[in-house]
């Protein structure tokens, strides 16, 4: 069983990634699979600048990593987290595109629809940002809270 760290470790832009991971593991797409039965270890990296690699999964160690880079939004973190969970679920597939091939892309799209209710076409590319933008749009504009004058 993966270790639980202090709450602040998982907090990214107001989102507790550990709690979000637990919610995502209960999605119908993962039902009956290893991910529904066994919690992976979640690590959060916090570099000083945005890296080329914003997350990764190591299926053999049942571990994922999400990078909380400067300027990350909650939608970015959600996209990265679910992307890496889908890697654990799907694993390495045969063929030339064993990690990001058609099977992975179909599973990722289904997971995004189930998790966030997104009504977007499947993207042609697997590059980070497409689903994050849709999640942020679905969240809506941030509401300002103004004090009431007495």
Language-model segments: what does each one mean?
Residues 79-92:
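Active-site recognition of the HExxH zinc-binding catalytic motif
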